[in-house]
Amino acid sequence: MREQRPSIYQKASVWGIPFGLYLTCAGVASVFMDWFPPLAFIFMLLVLGSPLVVYYFQRKHFIEENGFAEHAALWMLGIMLYMLGTVLASFIMFLVIQYGRPEFAYDQANHIIKVYSDIPEMRDSEFVTVLKRAVETHQLPSPIETVFNAFWFVTFGGCITSAITAILARRNIKKRP
């Protein structure tokens, strides 16, 4: 009788938890990097490393399937990892922003206004005027809107990235003597 192997969806649900925690670390670093500048470097490392983490899981699945996993299956695994990981990270990030830094969007906007106002060519630009008006009239996104937009951005980017990492994960398995 054939051994029942877990599907890519089952694997993604298990592997999506550590990946979601990984994405959460990147999100926390992005929210607090203006308070602690070395977090900007950590954030960049985590963002650039996320395709490597997905590649690791895709490659692991490919090897477990003895090299018979198709590109579409590996791509779907990557998509599901990003989807499930981003759901977990989004929930945690909402709590972090809502209760840890509820004025995050306004802090960032005020920082941008200050930086652009210090540049003589940009001081009276339309961008600065519009951003000042948005801050004054409280039109910047709420924490849930910020997290929701980040969810779609990471998920879409992850879908594209997963296609590339799936190609790389399908390289030949080395034969053992």
Language-model segment annotations:
Residues 92-120:
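Functional transmembrane-helix hotspots
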Residues 18, 22-30, 50, 85-93, ...:
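Alpha-helical transmembrane segments of multipass membrane proteins
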Residues 58-74, 98:
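Membrane-helix interface/capping segments
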Residues 133-159:
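Individual transmembrane alpha-helix segments
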Residues 75-103:
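Juxtamembrane "helix-exit" motif at the C-terminal end of transmembrane alpha-helices
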Residues 1-62:
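Transmembrane alpha-helical insertion/packing segments
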Residues 116-142:
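Short membrane-interface loop/juxtamembrane segments of multi-pass integral membrane proteins
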Residues 1-5, 169-177:
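Short, charged juxtamembrane terminal tails flanking transmembrane helices
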